[in-house]
């Protein structure tokens, strides 16, 4: 354990152990059911559902309090209520620690909430995962060596020493087992050695052996000086032996609250004795299910439990003589080596400044990404293959009218490719979303730091994509501008990737469903392509649709590459004899064309020959209505779209990551 002087200054005199007691009294939580279809007419009242109804109990330091019940009984809701995950005003009743109401900022420091899902980066090792958790949660005043010592101690406590250098793994990469993964998930949340630990069904989805090992670890954590409160669906007999107290719920009400060892006596007095060699938890849940299906429901069992509790209180007559004020208990806990990060009277919102958070997040991203080179390499390969395909289709286009149309077609398809290829990043944040929610719930880092690091880490990847596409198309298609033109072409491709990926990132932050986010992304990009100016010129778009033209992400990069290609006024694209191309006169002899040009010269009052330039690049830009911004203005607007969507992404995280229930 770390020394206390690295965390908080306390009296050097011997401080006796003062146990923590988390008490909750008469917790009631109601929700208004939303009507999914139709409207509510007249003054019919909204339907109210009670999720918690008068829940009272306590949990003590060194003990495991388990909340049992069938699905929908209110287990997770009660965990959320105790963990401060329900908005103030919605929850009735009180939750106190050593007799003092818990403020949300203090609760973040002294507690941890382990979600049911194992939310971890797959390509980090066990040790790296816990070390990053230490960087986020432990005080910056602690040295790197002390943080590493804490990680080593925790790895040993969790029984993960043999796999500490093994990656977490996922569907495509072999890693730790399910039980080990669950213990790592617990470890990331208890890195700061919390006083109170909440867990939502930590044994869910595990085999009996793995589940037993998880509960063994939780027992060690409780004995180290923590209160452990967890929900569990149907524990085995071995697991029941590790539980100190059990609360059994049915429809949001307590039907039993005591030591699991008293369950046989409880049900025997209720009139439903537990058969010998029967799994106690299984019998309890089956009996409750039968009662819930009866006309009276579980009212009789709820009332019997109340009488049971009253008799127990009269017999025990045990006051809370060990309970102490919260401040004294925290100081005593710190003196014994608990890693509460600071004084309970002065709690910082974050342990690190924003720039340190940004560096840590960027480092974690880079490690995770560099261990999946096949993903990055595949995307670069696909973009380069697309560029190679376009280069072979539009190989060395000339300066004829037909060549102009081919250039326009190439630019439209190329710019669309930039944006559509960004859609493969949609699942990335959606997969990380719950990791982000878990970490920011305890103020591990700022949302702004996450957005900045996320943006910075993507830049090298986007630059590699840009180089790959530009190098395989510019010279082989025969685009204009030489080296300067290539550099600008590379810049606008990079800006397009930046803008497209920023848009996709924003969508993934707003819509947490992969299929829906794909639909929104491709739908919006299709409209952007339609109104970009290639299919319909700006002056042909009706006034009621012109706004789509100006918010089209493809408009500005498309106009930028046209500027880069056609801005040279000395370059000619339609000469005298080419005026007949793509018309019924295209097949006539050159002599006839010369006579026609001579006749047209007389009517127009100007000399027209085969070499007379009729349309320059500047004329083409005017014909397509590209006059409002120059090529640099188009580049800046494209880049600005990227920053705009990153800002929107930040606000989507700010508004969408409120973890409390209404």
UniProtKB/Swiss-Prot annotation:
Keyword Secreted attached: no
Keywords recorded for this protein, A-Z: ATP-binding, Membrane, Nucleotide-binding, Transmembrane, Transmembrane helix, Transport
Residues the entry annotates as binding ATP: 69-76
Keyword Membrane recorded: yes
Gene Ontology cellular component list: membrane
Span of domain ABC transmembrane type-2: 356-566
InterPro entries assigned: AAA+_ATPase (IPR003593), ABC2_TM (IPR013525), ABC_transporter-like_ATP-bd (IPR003439), ABC_transporter-like_CS (IPR017871), ABCG_transporters (IPR050352), P-loop_NTPase (IPR027417)
Localization per record: Membrane
Gene3D superfamilies: P-loop containing nucleotide triphosphate hydrolases
SMART domains tied to this protein: AAA (SM00382)
Segments passing through the bilayer: 375-395, 410-430, 451-471, 486-508, 514-536, 635-655
Membrane topology: Multi-pass membrane protein
GO molecular function: ABC-type transporter activity; ATP binding; ATP hydrolysis activity
Ranges of residues in domain ABC transporter: 22-276
Family of the protein in this entry: Belongs to the ABC transporter superfamily. ABCG family. Eye pigment precursor importer (TC 3.A.1.204) subfamily.
PANTHER family, per database record: ABC TRANSPORTER G FAMILY MEMBER 17-RELATED, ABC TRANSPORTER G FAMILY MEMBER 28
Protein name per UniProt: ABC transporter G family member 17
Organism encoding this protein: Arabidopsis thaliana
């Amino acid at each position: 354990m770390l020394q206390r002087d690295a965390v908080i200054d306390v009296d050097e005199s011997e401080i006796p152990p003062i146990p923590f007691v988390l008490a909750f009294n008469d917790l009631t939580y109601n929700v208004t059911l939303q009507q999914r279809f139709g409207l509510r007419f007249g003054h019919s009242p909204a339907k109210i559902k009670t999720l918690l109804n008068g829940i009272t109990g306590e949990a003590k330091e060194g003990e495991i309090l388990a909340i049992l019940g069938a699905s929908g009984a209110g287990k997770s809701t009660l965990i959320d209520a105790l963990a401060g995950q329900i908005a103030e005003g919605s929850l009735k009743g009180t939750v106190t620690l050593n007799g003092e109401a818990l403020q949300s900022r203090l609760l973040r420091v002294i507690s941890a909430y382990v979600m049911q899902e194992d939310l971890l980066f797959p390509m980090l090792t066990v040790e790296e995962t816990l070390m990053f958790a230490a960087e986020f949660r432990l005080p910056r005043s602690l040295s790197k060596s002390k943080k590493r010592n804490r990680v080593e101690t925790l790895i040993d406590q969790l029984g993960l020493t043999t796999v500490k250098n093994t990656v977490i793994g996922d569907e495509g990469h072999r890693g730790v087992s399910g039980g080990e993964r669950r213990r790592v998930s617990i470890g990331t949340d208890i890195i700061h050695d919390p006083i109170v630990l909440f867990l939502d069904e930590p044994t869910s989805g595990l085999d009996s052996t793995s589940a037993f090992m998880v509960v063994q670890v939780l027992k060690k954590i409780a004995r180290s000086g923590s209160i452990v409160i967890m929900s569990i669906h149907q524990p085995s007999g071995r697991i029941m032996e590790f539980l100190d107290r059990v609360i059994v719920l049915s429809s949001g009400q307590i039907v039993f609250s005591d030591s699991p060892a008293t369950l046989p006596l409880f049900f025997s007095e209720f009139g439903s004795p537990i058969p010998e060699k029967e799994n106690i938890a299984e019998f309890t849940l089956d009996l409750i299910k039968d009662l819930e299906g009866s006309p009276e429901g579980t009212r009789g069992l709820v009332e019997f439990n109340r009488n049971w509790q009253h008799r127990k209180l009269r017999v025990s007559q045990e006051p809370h003589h060990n309970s102490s004020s919260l401040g004294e208990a925290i100081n005593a806990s710190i003196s014994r080596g608990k890693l509460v990060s600071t004084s309970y009277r002065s709690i910082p919102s974050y342990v690190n400044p924003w720039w340190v958070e940004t560096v840590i997040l960027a480092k974690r991203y880079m490690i995770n990404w560099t261990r999946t080179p096949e993903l990055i390499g595949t995307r670069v390969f696909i973009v380069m293959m697309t560029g190679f395909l376009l280069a072979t289709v539009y190989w060395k286009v000339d300066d004829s009218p037909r060549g102009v149309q081919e250039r326009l077609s190439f630019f439209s398809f190329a710019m669309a490719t930039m944006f559509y290829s960004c859609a493969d990043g949609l699942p990335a944040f959606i997969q990380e979303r719950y990791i982000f929610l878990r970490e920011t719930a305890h103020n591990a880092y700022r949302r702004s730091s996450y957005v900045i690091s996320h943006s910075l880490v993507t830049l090298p990847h986007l630059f590699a994509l840009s180089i790959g596409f530009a190098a395989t198309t510019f010279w082989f298609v025969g685009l204009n501008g030489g080296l300067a033109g290539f550099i600008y072409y590379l810049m606008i491709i990079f800006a397009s990737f930046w803008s497209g990926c920023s848009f996709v990132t924003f969508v993934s932050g707003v819509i947490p469903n992969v299929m829906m986010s794909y639909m929104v992304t491709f739908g919006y990009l299709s409209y952007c392509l339609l109104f970009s100016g290639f299919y319909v010129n700006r002056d042909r778009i009706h006034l009621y649709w012109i706004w789509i033209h100006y918010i089209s992400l493809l408009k500005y990069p498309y106009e930028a590459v046209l500027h880069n290609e056609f801005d040279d006024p000395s370059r000619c694209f339609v000469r005298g004899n080419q005026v007949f191309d793509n018309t019924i006169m295209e097949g006539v002899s050159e002599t006839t064309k010369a006579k026609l040009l001579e006749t047209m010269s007389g009517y127009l009052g100007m000399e027209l020959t085969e070499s007379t330039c009729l349309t320059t690049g500047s004329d083409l830009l005017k014909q397509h209505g590209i006059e409002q911004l120059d090529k640099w203005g188009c580049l800046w607007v494209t880049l600005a779209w990227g920053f705009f969507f990153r800002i929107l992404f930040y606000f989507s995280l700010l508004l969408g990551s409120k973890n409390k229930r209404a």
